[in-house]
Amino acid sequence: MKIALFGTSADPPTLAHRAILIWLAQHFDQVAVWAADNPFKQGPNPETGHWASLGDRQAMLKLLVEDVQKDYATVQIWEDLSDRRSLISLQRAQQRWGLEPDYALVVGADLIRQISQWYAVKELLPAVQLVIFPRPGYGINQADLDKLAQLGGHYQLVNQGDDQAITPPISSSIYRQIRDDDLIPDPVQSYIQQRQLYRQ
């Protein structure tokens, strides 16, 4: 059994998040997704570094996942896996599904350089496969990949040629900059308007 673990800031979730979830559903038996605080974020909230509260981000991600589940029921939210430390999330997944499954940790290309600074990274990396998605504005440096390998990591790069259409060149940060509603799913757009988020 192959299980993908996808903790995301979801600040807000975009059509790129939707595309990633669909790709994962097509390649894994189970996709576990949750909204998480990223300790490296530098947003306006001094406590979390994010733009929207964790509660709002969880609600928006739930709306996105409910939309994806119409076609891919194996994509499910597991908020109890959420932790600022990926190793803790993995350990909680192992408590839920056991040690037998092959676990993959889903990350964006923007995180590759940060991973070596993560909590207990030498324990984390040998226990999972990293599935790395391209991100607009972030190249993938072979030296950074080599460093991951030295730390015991093994990874899969989502093909940036054949799969480019699967991950559109948009991101939460691009949405926050230009406020283009075409970048986010309709249910998320309605929630943002209702809650008056991202107005600054």
From Swiss-Prot:
Phylogenetic lineage: Bacteria, Bacillati, Cyanobacteriota, Cyanophyceae, Synechococcales
Pfam families, per database record: CTP_transf_like
Family: Belongs to the NadD family.
UniProt superkingdom: Bacteria
Biological processes per GO annotation: NAD biosynthetic process
Pathway stated in the Swiss-Prot or TrEMBL entry: Cofactor biosynthesis; NAD(+) biosynthesis; deamido-NAD(+) from nicotinate D-ribonucleotide: step 1/1
Molecular-function GO terms, alphabetical: ATP binding; nicotinamide-nucleotide adenylyltransferase activity; nicotinate-nucleotide adenylyltransferase activity
InterPro entries recorded: Cyt_trans-like (IPR004821), NadD/NMNAT (IPR005248), Rossmann-like_a/b/a_fold (IPR014729)
Annotated keywords: ATP-binding, NAD, Nucleotide-binding, Nucleotidyltransferase, Pyridine nucleotide biosynthesis, Transferase
Signal peptide start and end residues: none
NCBIfam families cross-referenced by the UniProt entry: nicotinate (nicotinamide) nucleotide adenylyltransferase, PRK00071.2-1
UniProt EC number: 2.7.7.18
Designated name of the protein: Probable nicotinate-nucleotide adenylyltransferase
Catalyzed chemical reaction(s): nicotinate beta-D-ribonucleotide + ATP + H(+) = deamido-NAD(+) + diphosphate
Top-level EC class: transferase
Described purpose of this protein according to its UniProt entry: Catalyzes the reversible adenylation of nicotinate mononucleotide (NaMN) to nicotinic acid adenine dinucleotide (NaAD).
